[in-house]
């Protein structure tokens, strides 16, 4: 596991991110000590048992397709399928790994297709994805020509799922670090920062937006995707307890309110690029995610509402400049 992080340290040592090395190694060492008491050791065993295969065919431009069935023996493919299944649930994807189709809960490729026409080209950029899950979008960012891609997410499982994919496509310019946003110093070095599906989980959304801005170089672009509701700049939903069965949802603003928040913390040229209702085809139970999904979170008699009676999930994409 240390080699994952050592590779990252070496990659940033001579870059505008080098000052991150003042704090990052100690943070990750602390994480390793904490994580060793949970499920991480069993997932590390899964990773160690993945077969060594020379991957020749990779497509991360139109999808995340790593390898073809012919590059593995039948035995290796069965072994890989068994091991990847042990890392369930798989939430963000889909992935194709040497003919194994990982049909994830979310069709994250649909979100990517919605936002891609609206963002600045990623070619040659240094990119950060905050709350990146198991890293599906990291690969798509790299596929668009980003020079260096970093994702952060505090989940041990997401880290190991990412490393399982990277095992078959060992790209030294795509990395995932098991950190929350609160662990980031003011790096002010990224050309583009993505935050998708995180804002409503933060108790202080204004502080969170300021943290996002602090990661961008002057003139860099924020791509923000989050839950919103209909209304004017004074409209914000604060659930009394749960929203769509989630306890950790704190603030769901209207797009107008969110735009105002972003401007208050200093973002410029804030633009609302897309609004889309989350459909039952985009988020659903699959053979790779057998727990409850969106259909279980909505009112069975009126899918325009959550099971608690709030408006059903509506997701917006906004862009802004630091």
UniProtKB/Swiss-Prot annotation:
GO terms for MF: methyltransferase activity; transferase activity, transferring alkyl or aryl (other than methyl) groups
Q: Which UniProt keywords apply?
A: Transferase, tRNA processing
The record, for Pfam families, names: Methyltransf_9
Biological processes, Gene Ontology terms? tRNA wobble uridine modification
Note the InterPro entries from the entry.
CmoB, Mo5U34_MeTrfas-like, SAM-dependent_MTases_sf
Residues bound to carboxy-S-adenosyl-L-methionine are 92, 106, 111, 131, 153-155, 181-182, 196, 200, 315
Kindly give the Gene3D superfamilies that the UniProt entry links to this protein.
Vaccinia Virus protein VP39
Asked if Transferase is a keyword of the record, the answer is yes
EC number(s) reported in the record? 2.5.1.-
Q: Which reaction does it catalyse?
A: carboxy-S-adenosyl-L-methionine + 5-hydroxyuridine(34) in tRNA = 5-carboxymethoxyuridine(34) in tRNA + S-adenosyl-L-homocysteine + H(+)
Q: Which NCBIfam families does this UniProt record tie to the protein?
A: PRK15068.1, tRNA 5-methoxyuridine(34)/uridine 5-oxyacetic acid(34) synthase CmoB
Give the multimer and partner information: Homotetramer.
> Function, please?
Catalyzes carboxymethyl transfer from carboxy-S-adenosyl-L-methionine (Cx-SAM) to 5-hydroxyuridine (ho5U) to form 5-carboxymethoxyuridine (cmo5U) at position 34 in tRNAs.
Q: Please state which protein family the record places this protein in.
A: Belongs to the class I-like SAM-binding methyltransferase superfamily. CmoB family.
**Protein name, per record:** tRNA U34 carboxymethyltransferase
Gene name as annotated: cmoB
